[in-house]
């Protein structure tokens, strides 16, 4: 009788083939410090639950006999609270939903579009993502909170900062219309950058 050698698992990156067999959901979440990828593994036969944020394992639970429930963790530099809800749909089918700060991902992103402005630009051979948080006037560039200086000008305000050797500012002016409110414009080296929708 011939013997078949046992297969040994080779050490590898966190995204190994073994991981992909139980991968059930992937979400991209845009926060001020960048776009974060959240991946969720749910082994319905093994009871395994694993949450990855940007490829890094945040939660691992084995032998969870209760297949429905929730997993809560933090995302990004601001440690934003995120929860994955696991609900039974029918039989052995499951639905996975992501909540950010207690809101559905869709509702959270709709709300964020009202409270932030985002610009994507290419500068010195690098792709940059600039985010303005309207409530605090904090400015982020590729995940780093920028040092800023505010200045009042005739028609509004300017929030000045630098990206490398480039002078930048975000100009805030009234739209003159109550529903539109304040219009924010990013200027880099005296050139207006279109906002990302």
Predicted regions and their residues:
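Cysteine-centric segments in proteins
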Residues: 2-197
């Amino acid at each position: 009788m011939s013997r078949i050698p046992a297969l040994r698992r080779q050490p590898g990156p966190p995204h190994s083939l073994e991981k992909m067999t139980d991968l059930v959901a992937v979400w991209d979440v845009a926060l001020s410090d960048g776009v974060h990828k959240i991946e969720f593994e749910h082994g319905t036969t093994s009871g395994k639950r694993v949450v990855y944020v940007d490829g890094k394992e945040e939660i691992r639970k084995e032998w969870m006999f209760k297949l429905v429930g929730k997993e809560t963790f933090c995302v990004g530099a601001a440690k934003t609270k995120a929860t994955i809800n696991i609900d039974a749909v029918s039989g052995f089918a499951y639905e996975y939903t992501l909540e950010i700060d207690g809101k559905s991902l869709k509702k959270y992103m709709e709300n964020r579009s009202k409270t932030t402005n985002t610009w994507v630009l290419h500068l010195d051979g690098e792709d940059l993502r600039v985010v303005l948080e309207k409530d605090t006037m904090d400015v982020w560039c590729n995940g780093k909170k920028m040092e800023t200086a505010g200045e009042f000008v005739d028609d509004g305000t300017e929030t000045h900062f630098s990206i490398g050797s480039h002078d930048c500012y975000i100009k805030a002016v009234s739209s003159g219309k109550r529903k539109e409110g304040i219009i924010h414009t990013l200027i880099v080296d005296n050139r207006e950058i279109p906002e990302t929708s």
